[in-house]
Amino acid sequence: MSNTRHKIKAVILLSGGLDSTTTLAIAKTKNFECYSLSFDYGQKQKSELKSAENFAKIFGSIKHRVMKISLSNIDFSALTDDKIDIPKFSKSDDIPITYVPARNTIFLSYALSWSEVLDCQHIFIGVNTLDYSGYPDCREIYIKAFEVMANLATKQSIEGKKLTIHTPLIHLNKAQIIKKGLSLGIDYSLTTTCYQADKSGKACGICDACEYRKLGFIEAKVADPTRYQI
């Protein structure tokens, strides 16, 4: 008899990139019954959604939903606004133009809603605060604050079913994340990290996401399987 009914449900935010795919794999190793959630939010490149679909199947997600929402009308981020170019990588303490206003708050809110429908008290998100672009909604203090808010805002929390937001990568650098993922059998050539990957998923090689990814493989001392345009 299948033991899936005894597993604990979890909603996994899955973009199809290196971090979120590793997070899904970690959730599976912890024996969670995974429900993957991706977003078509008006991002310039859509190849990450194909990657998300592939990994949802590879890691046996019970369901994979792609929520179609529009953040492109905000006209602020280089990831969604056609009038703003994706910048080349640069080291800076400033929040970059690739920041999408309140994106993780929006994504987590959808995950929260779906988790309540599923009678699920666990959400996984692949944020980390090392080797990242400095987005404020990737910080641990933000995730903890959202968890507090969520446990004041839902029917299931009021009934005693408290939500936990899991951030298994929060204190890992890219090299550590890559090593962890490889130990779990992830084929990183199938992930899409680049902010402006082409339709086939080939990465630009010059944006922040590409540079952090390249550095991660170098520091992990393993071959980078990423297909780069340059």
Swiss-Prot record:
It holds the Pfam family QueC. Zn(2+) binds at C194, C204, C207, C210. GO terms for molecular function: ATP binding; ligase activity, forming carbon-nitrogen bonds; zinc ion binding. Its cofactor is Zn(2+). It is an enzyme of class 6 (ligase). InterPro entries: QueC (IPR018317), Rossmann-like_a/b/a_fold (IPR014729). ATP binds at L14, S15, G16, G17, L18, D19, S20, T21, T22, T23, L24. Binds 1 zinc ion per subunit. It comes from the Bacteria. NCBIfam families: 7-cyano-7-deazaguanine synthase QueC (TIGR00364). This is 7-cyano-7-deazaguanine synthase. It comes from Ruthia magnifica subsp. Calyptogena magnifica.
